[in-house]
Amino acid sequence: MKFEVISQIENIEVISVGTDIRNLAYLEKAYGSGRWRKLKGVAHVRLPNGNIRWVELHWYEAHGIGRKNIKIKRYVE
């Protein structure tokens, strides 16, 4: 699903780091090696139909590579 993050991501928590990540081999092959972390947080997003919703997001991040594979996991509001 396409969406646009329109606010700062808040309440960021680390879910897992390094070899604890199931998709680590994919991340390193697609984006390069690094200290990969899986994180979650909440933010306002604009959905394709124009609605703005408060959602929980999950994504992967590595220093020097940035945020990758941002996904909506659930609607908070």
Question: Which residues make up each language-model segment?
Answer:
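Cysteine-centric segments in proteins
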Residues: M1-E77
